[in-house]
Amino acid sequence: MKNKNILTTILVIALLSIFLIKSTNNNFFKMNSKYKLQSFNLDQDPLKTKIYTLENGLKVFLTEYKNAPRLQTSIAVRAGSKHDPSDATGLAHYLEHMLFKGTNKYGTINFTEEKPLLDKIEDLYEEYRKVPMSNVSEREKIWSKIDSLSNEAAKFAIANEYDKMVSGIGAKGTNAYTSNEKTVYINDIPSNQIEKWLKLESERFRNPIFRLFHTELETVYEEKNRGLDDDGRKLFYEMLDAVFPNHQYGQQTTIGTIKHLKNPSLKEIQKYYDKYYVPNNMAICISGDFESESMIELIDKYFGGFESKEVPNFEVIKERPIEKIIERSVVGPQAERLYIAFRFPGASSKDIHKLRMADMIMSNRTAGLIDLNLNQSQKIIGGGSFPFILEDYSTHVFYGSPKQNQNLNEVRDLLVGQIEELKNGNFPDWLMKAIISDLKLEQIKKYENNQGRANEYVEAFTLGIEWSEYIQMIDEMSKLNKQDIIDFANQYYKDNYAVVYKEQGEDIVEKVTKPNITPVSVNRESKTDFLNSLLAEEVNEIEPVFIDFENDINYGKIDEVPLHYMKNFENQRFELTYVFEAGTNVNPVNKIAFEYLQFLGTDSITSKQKQEILYKLGSEMSFNCSDDQVKINISGLDENFEETVKFLESFLSNFKSDEEALQKLKEDILKKRSDAKLNKQTILFNAMVNFAKYGENSPFTNKLTNEFINNIKSNDLVSKVKDVYASKHIVKYYGPRDISDVEKQLLILHKNKSNLNDIVDAKMFTEIERKTPTVYFLDYDMKQAEVIVISKNEKLNPTLIPISRLHNEYFGGGMSSVMFQELRESQALAYSVYSTFTTPRKINDSHFQLSYIGTQADKLEEAMMGMMNLLNEMPKSEGNLNAAKEGIVQKIRTERITKSAIMNYIERAKKMGLSSDSRKNIFENIENFSMDDVENFHNEKISNQNYTYLVLADKKSINFELLSKYGKVEFLTLEKVFGY
């Protein structure tokens, strides 16, 4: 979900005072604004927040965090789908999309000539929505006029000019999202571009113009149809509908109903904007490298002139108590699972602290009731819980999936059984104290990045909770005792819940059909004075910082074992990882062996007790086996470093086999394998892509047979773990201790540090040289069609990294890319589309060109034709190319790889045969590339290749004669691409 907004006319800014000419929308005026700093006890605030309120009511949340010369920015509006009119749902989401379309000052070649056409289009939509949907001929007649006028108006529009500007200042992660009661606009920007960003955002929200609406409308249709194919979304919406039969939470989805989507109203969207997009209903939330005093001056300079308005009170619909169990079901092709949901009061209720504590007692990933009694005991698959807290009401959701030969009713009963355990107080006395420690540690981790910090402000503001109260949540939870939770549980958890079963089957649902849309002009070369002026403003450039492979990591030794060390200067958290080059490409059994470990105990402790000990320590322990590596990881607070390492080493030396656990693990592995073949993301992006690259013998299919799994013995798995643990490895440490202390402690504690075994060479997989174009089709029950076009190129060539980075940014890498503009903005053929020339992870692997488009099945012909036209003949735009260059340069200047990520970055680079930071090569060369260079790269590496086409869709909706134009059509089976 992404996309675009506030008022009309001119903003003239002096250095210390602001003179604003009143706009036609009356949200924007005067003025010499003032702002107030909110006072509260900063000692209780780990973020040391400064909260300002401008004279017009705009809230500003600021936290300084100088980890990198960048800022995470979020502009939050307290308006979401619950505020949509009941007869025009989806407005908040539509408006979010339109806030990327520009104003009367940017996004247009000539607004004076454009506006009369936009006014006519707006009126035509009002006519259109009044005509009954049964009157097809009349609606088609009006739609034809809308399409024609939209094409005329588009001649004056400049598509994606907002995206060009944010890219030009080096922004990353540009996006937006709408939910029940908030709409949030986000950017990650360089710290030397603050004023440009504020100037752009001020203009964006001043007077949004709803241009290019009918192509964006089709994009929303695509988003709706993707939702209709998403079993998880269907399950969640059905749950909300059951729990909230009257309130908008259950009766108005963010995307809107099909009926309302087909009858949009620009006038209603404008009313929504005028009503809710006012400063006293908005907040600017920023975390990063800046000075708060100068930041608030700039925010006041650019936003102080917005006029406050009274925001209508939201009338909360009172729900009647749920007095019996409500059962619902949804169907779809993906794996079975269920939700159990209880209704609770809203975010401001004092009971919310008890709800959060109850949720952690039920499920905290390690030692909750569901974690231990159901997951660790292997009674269900993937059980857990989460609180869904909103302003008016909240929901406590429990979830789980069935094992082999288990039905959803059994999963429900097992989850409800754990709720009864909570009500009876059958949880250990120490657990609540450990939960508080866990929450504090999770908060430390969350606050180690700007996004986590800014998101906290958005959450508090949009829930209507004062920050001074929000930051005391953990302290308030720490005051609760066991009896408080028992009483709370018995008050709320009764036969008063909704259970929604996600069953397998064919879902007969209406989809949003494709309207006839004539492709519109995108005016790629045009630029407004606003863009030229903004990007021409000079800033003090920030010098890039590149990784020094020799000096940015400290290297030590633990006897024979290499130690890679990075110091944590920020807090008391540590991470310790043992890395073995012994992944599934060495032996597929290793994956099951290390999965088996998590369910084992020792002679002195059970598997459950192992989890409880870790949770008491505030530590986590994990075992992961990928294609390449086995990683044994522990993390936690430094005060428990020695004890955690001792526990890990003792466990690895003394774990004992458990035949019952192994049998259950086998069953679960086979069930998860079966479920994976129902997941369209796994099918397309893993199974089919690997098949295209390697054929049937690929890293993805390098798995044990089901027969082998059924016959494997505990001794085999125990032997594999011990073999790996006794082999050569490296130790990676990130934490607050000095390297000498780490070496000293691990020399004592780490047992396998000498006389280590060599690891056998990994299996190599041969990439297929395809001589002729081929279309591989796989049948899947869904409304959409998803297509990947892929072609093999040369082996890893580091000299291609700079030019391919520029090509990707220009051609297919973002919202201002050629592919996005043509296929989404101009032709409205897709919600999601991208193209990338990949850089392989290993020396002997090849580059691949991979392009993706997700579209409605009835638009597949146009979508594939549009994509192939672009792949075979790249449109040229000097303006877009220069913007792509500048965006890359600004990102590299301000990107900082820090903390433990430095070790991971160097490790990946060395596997590619690199001895230095590839970003330095990009930075030093990218300005030298011309359009001819990019075109030559495209013609040589992308155009007219022996493409392999991967198509995932419902065969009943596909014209195979069309597909045969692209190559020989071969029908794949799940068994063939999964290897089992």
Model-derived segments and spans:
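N-terminal Sec-pathway targeting helices
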Residues: 1-11
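Bacterial Sec-dependent signal peptides at the C-terminal "C-region" and cleavage site
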Residues: 13-42
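Charge-rich, well-structured scaffold segments of protease-associated domains
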Residues: 28-29, 53, 64, 111-311, ...
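Mature N-terminal segment immediately following signal peptide/propeptide cleavage
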Residues: 38-75, 554-570
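Active/ligand-binding-proximal structured segments within catalytic/core domains
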Residues: 57, 66-111, 115, 334, ...
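Short strand-connecting beta-turns/loops that link adjacent beta-strands
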Residues: 66-68, 278, 333-334, 392, ...
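His/Glu-based metal-binding/catalytic segments typifying zinc-dependent metallopeptidases
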Residues: 225, 241, 312-367, 399, ...
